[in-house]
């Protein structure tokens, strides 16, 4: 008999809580996503995260620690090499990434790859550099609309991103080109973690807006994860946001795309009204995409306050035999130089209405603590070659 019938894990994408011990190896010095956001604003009101003990883990301006937080808290460390979305999420479900995914941040993509992409898609390519999505649209959006060329760019992550204006380039055409790019980049020397379709609207510089029709074409996980174990043993695995894309559909029984992080929380609240047995895995991407990468601490703080209101509704809806875990996949300090992710600890906040105790757990050495705890709860073995130790027996 499972201790919890339903487990909900909500990933606040990029909500790091302070530099990891090895962060300087990643070029990240004194980074602190949550701490620096709080220092950048005049007021910061997150009463539900506060009640769950987030300020007990980490000093946060305007948010005091609480004497008796609900549930259990820990600062989780990342065992894998990297600080990107796929590494973080794959590790949560048990995989240990020891070789970083290929990046083309400094060089752009090889000409041979671009030539093949042009030949297969029929579109010339412009861009081919590391850039922020909004800047590259201002630079090349008008050119694309006039010529039909493809805007290809990358970032510090292992990604090849293709932009297409929805009305002139066409959404289906953009997806077709991305599928070809995914096929081409399965070669070892070009193997990026994700191809991302970046559709946008608008006709001139300063007015371009990316739409919610983004699609990620990820590599399949290189091994079995906790999600596969759950699905193969007839448990529900319901995803919200970009989770299905991150795992290329592996181990997911139902995928729900979100238009925004607020929408993702609304979807989660609807799923909570359903009767199911298994796991609901939620990713809220706006924190990272709209505020972290764009180095906007004010926007990030406001998004967290909106999230906290919906978190209150989630807490109210939890059944006695539900478990809620709030976490993140990496940091993205909006006050730090550049536009890239930051290597940080992430929160592990676990709560069920059936808990009698509360308190801080020792720092787990891996994000896979989450996957191991889920597997343990449902009486499943961790897949061969995975990492992670369950803390289920500590959640009392």
UniProtKB/Swiss-Prot annotation:
Its main location: cytoplasm. It comes from the Bacteria. HAMAP family: Phosphopentomut (MF_00740). Keywords: Cytoplasm, Isomerase, Manganese, Metal-binding. It is an enzyme of class 5 (isomerase). Its cofactor is Mn(2+). GO terms for molecular function: magnesium ion binding; manganese ion binding; phosphopentomutase activity. Binds 2 manganese ions. Mn(2+) 1 binds at residues 13, 329-330. Belongs to the phosphopentomutase family. Its EC number is 5.4.2.7. It is found in: Cytoplasm. Pathway: Carbohydrate degradation; 2-deoxy-D-ribose 1-phosphate degradation; D-glyceraldehyde 3-phosphate and acetaldehyde from 2-deoxy-alpha-D-ribose 1-phosphate: step 1/2. This is Phosphopentomutase. Mn(2+) 2 binds at residues 288, 293, 341. GO terms for cellular component: cytosol.
């Amino acid at each position: 008999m499972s201790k919890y019938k339903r487990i909900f894990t909500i990933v606040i994408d990029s909500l790091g809580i302070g530099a990891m011990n090895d962060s300087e190896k990643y070029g990240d010095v004194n980074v602190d996503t949550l701490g620096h956001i709080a220092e950048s604003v005049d007021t910061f009101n997150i009463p539900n995260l506060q009640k769950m003990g987030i300020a007990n883990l980490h000093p946060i301006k305007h948010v005091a620690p609480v004497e008796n937080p609900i549930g259990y808290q820990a600062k989780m460390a990342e065992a894998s090499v990297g600080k990107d979305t796929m590494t973080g999420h794959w590790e949560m479900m048990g995989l240990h990434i020891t070789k970083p995914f290929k990046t083309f941040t400094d060089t752009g993509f090889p000409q041979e790859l671009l030539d093949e992409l042009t030949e297969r898609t029929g579109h010339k390519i412009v861009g081919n550099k590391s850039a922020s999505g909004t800047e590259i649209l201002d630079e090349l959006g008008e050119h694309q609309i006039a010529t039909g060329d493809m805007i290809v760019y990358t970032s510090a992550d292992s990604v090849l991103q293709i932009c297409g204006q929805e009305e002139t380039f066409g959404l289906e055409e953009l997806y077709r080109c991305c599928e070809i790019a995914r096929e081409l980049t399965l070669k070892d020397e070009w193997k990026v973690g994700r191809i991302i379709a970046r559709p946008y609207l608008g006709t001139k510089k300063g007015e371009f807006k990316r739409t919610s029709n983004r699609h990620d074409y990820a590599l399949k996980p290189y091994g079995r994860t906790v999600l596969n174990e759950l699905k193969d043993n007839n448990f529900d695995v319901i995803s919200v946001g970009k989770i299905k894309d991150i795992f290329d559909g592996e181990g997911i029984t139902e995928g729900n795309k979100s238009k925004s992080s607020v929408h993702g929380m609304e979807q989660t609240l609807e799923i909570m009204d359903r009767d199911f047995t298994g796991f609901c895995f939620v990713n809220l991407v706006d924190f990272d995409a709209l505020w972290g990468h764009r180095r906007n601490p004010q926007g990030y703080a406001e998004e967290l306050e909106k999230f906290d209101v919906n978190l209150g509704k989630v807490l109210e809806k939890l059944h006695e035999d539900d478990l809620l875990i709030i976490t993140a996949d990496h940091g993205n300090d909006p006050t730090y130089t550049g536009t890239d992710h930051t290597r940080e600890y992430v929160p592990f906040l676990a709560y069920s209405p059936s808990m009698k105790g509360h308190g801080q757990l020792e720092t787990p050495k891996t994000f896979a603590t989450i996957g191991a705890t889920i597997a343990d709860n449902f009486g499943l073995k961790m897949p061969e070659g995975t990492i992670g130790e369950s803390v289920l027996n500590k959640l009392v």
